[in-house]
Amino acid sequence: MQTLHVELGERSYPIYIGSGLLSRPELLSRHVAGRQVAVVTNETVAPLYLQTLLKSLEGFNVATVVLPDGEAFKNWETLQLIFDGLLTARHDRRTTVVALGGGVIGDMAGFAAACYQRGVDFIQVPTTLLSQVDSSVGGKTGINHPLGKNMVGAFYQPKAVLIDTASLDTLPARELSAGLAEVIKYGLICDEPFLGWLEANMAALRSLDQDALTYAIERSCAAKAQVVGADERESGVRATLNLGHTFGHAIETEQGYGVWLHGEAVAAGTVMALEMSHRLGWISVAERDRGVRLLQAAGLPIVPPRDMTPAQFLEHMAVDKKVLDGQLRLVLLKRLGEAVVTADYPREILDATLRSDYVALAQSFNS
């Protein structure tokens, strides 16, 4: 087992990474202050891992809340089901909420913990690659709004993150690829040597090789922990973690939450960010194509939805959380391994990026 730490003073917490960790009761119990635990999971994960987790929580007063699965349910109505479960079980301020599932479960359970009786402890137990390398670390919690993704939420740090890599054995290939979008992101924004490792090991990652997956998770979490420790509330460098997300969130919102997986939308958005960085003269054609090819090798879409117009992108991007004083800030690449957050770009470059022929770009890789 590998243990990393997110350093936030008195709110610092560990990230445990290894196989079989769901069956190690001491990893959970050391972070549960009271006797009450509320496990929040979904209909897909519950049959696979809920009983294993409950066995590790023997001796505690445990309530379970099983939610419908999918991004389409990341909303107020589903959030209320968590509060209903906590109140029905008479859970008090010393309860600990445990999020067992992917990013949707982690975001909603964390937000519920932040709100319930003005804040109770919670633990992240992510079961998808995307949640293991990204959403479970850093304290971002929340729900979607019909007008924008993740627009309602709070920064609220967990007491611990427990990553059982064995849970990836049951992850569908599409979900695995979606998680790889966030793994690739770390190489693009802050760790160029990692890109070379990913290129050499992509086949192993996609075939669920445990050693390769564990290494990728550890390296991704280490990068995320370092950034969060330096900028917890996204006032500076943490915003670079959103490479591809401004374009990607527009895709998710316009297409309907859950039609594109988050990682799929981020992948297409990352291609657009690479294209814009190239148009600004910051990265070469070869560097752009290297990033796009790696996303393609991960089994991810590299073409935005063909039915989305530039106007539709701009409409959704206008309510992005990185908009400040009416200016749309974007995460772009100065080079592979170095990202910036900037609103200092010619509008015509953004317009050209939105009009680019990504189908032709994709076809050029297959010719």
Swiss-Prot record:
Q: Name one GO molecular function term.
A: 3-dehydroquinate synthase activity
Q: Which family does it belong to?
A: Belongs to the sugar phosphate cyclases superfamily. Dehydroquinate synthase family.
Family annotation (HAMAP family): DHQ_synthase
Which Pfam family, an example, fits this chain? DHQS_C
Q: Name one GO cellular component term.
A: cytoplasm
Q: In which pathway does it act?
A: Metabolic intermediate biosynthesis; chorismate biosynthesis; chorismate from D-erythrose 4-phosphate and phosphoenolpyruvate: step 2/7
**Stated role:** Catalyzes the conversion of 3-deoxy-D-arabino-heptulosonate 7-phosphate (DAHP) to dehydroquinate (DHQ).
Class of the enzyme per the UniProt entry, highest EC level: lyase
Q: InterPro entries recorded for this chain?
A: Dehydroquinate_synthase (IPR050071), DHQ_synth_AroB (IPR016037), DHQ_synth_fam (IPR030963), DHQS/DOIS_N (IPR030960), DHQS_C (IPR056179)
Residues binding Zn(2+) are E182, H245, H262
Task: From the Swiss-Prot or TrEMBL record, state where the protein is found.
Answer: Cytoplasm
Q: Coding gene?
A: aroB
The note describing how and how many cofactors are bound reads: Binds 1 divalent metal cation per subunit. Can use either Co(2+) or Zn(2+).
This chain's protein is named 3-dehydroquinate synthase
Cofactor field: Co(2+); Zn(2+); NAD(+)
Do you know which SUPFAM superfamilies this protein is assigned to? Answer: Dehydroquinate synthase-like
Keyword Transmembrane in the entry? The reply is no
Summarize where NAD(+) binds, as residue positions.
Answer: 69-74, 103-107, 127-128, 140, 149
User: Could you tell me the superkingdom of the organism this chain comes from?
Assistant: Bacteria
- Keywords for the protein's UniProt record, in alphabetical order: Amino-acid biosynthesis, Aromatic amino acid biosynthesis, Cobalt, Cytoplasm, Lyase, Metal-binding, NAD, Nucleotide-binding, Zinc
The species is: Ectopseudomonas mendocina (strain ymp) (Pseudomonas mendocina)
Q: Where are the transmembrane segments?
A: none
In the UniProt record, the signal sequence range is none
* Catalyzed reaction equations: 7-phospho-2-dehydro-3-deoxy-D-arabino-heptonate = 3-dehydroquinate + phosphate
Report the EC code(s) recorded for this entry: 4.2.3.4
Q: Does the keyword Nucleus apply?
A: no
